[in-house]
From Swiss-Prot:
Single annotated GO MF: structural constituent of ribosome
GO cellular component: large ribosomal subunit
Protein name per the record: Large ribosomal subunit protein uL10
Keywords assigned: Ribonucleoprotein, Ribosomal protein, RNA-binding, rRNA-binding
Single Gene Ontology BP annotation: translation
Amino acid sequence: MANPKNTADLAALKEKLEGANSIVLTEYRGLTVGQLQELRNNLGFDVEYSVAKNTLFKIAANEAGIEGLDEHLTGPTAIAFIKGEAVDAAKVITKFADDNKALVIKGGYMDGNALSADQVEAIAKLDNRETTLAKLAGAMKGSMAKAAAVFNAPATKMVRTAAALQDKKAAEA
């Protein structure tokens, strides 16, 4: 008969996996409770960071249709269940790992793909959604201003030519 606590933990893990749009797996061995709490606070409300048994996590991941993470499930594992912006969470975790060598990024999962630790760190170097949209809007605004100048140039040239002709005729008369 299954242990009731494990059954409840399994259901909770599966629910967290199904509610997350991405996850990051870390090894937390050597971190103090205070450091773990600091990481949780830095991650914010869109990310739930919790410790899980590897065997339960494997079962929950399989039930949730998530594959390719088994190789990362060795040693103590803490999982960041990310509901918000994955890039922002990856930045926080990567910076924390740089500052606290005891935190090791094992890998992750995003958009249906298992990620290596290097891929998680590469995602952390990307601009977040808001920054990317701002850059795109700025580029579009600049392009539209240039296009408007190009389209207005012939009309402006024609007006100047007509004004010059009018001035010339007025001077001749």
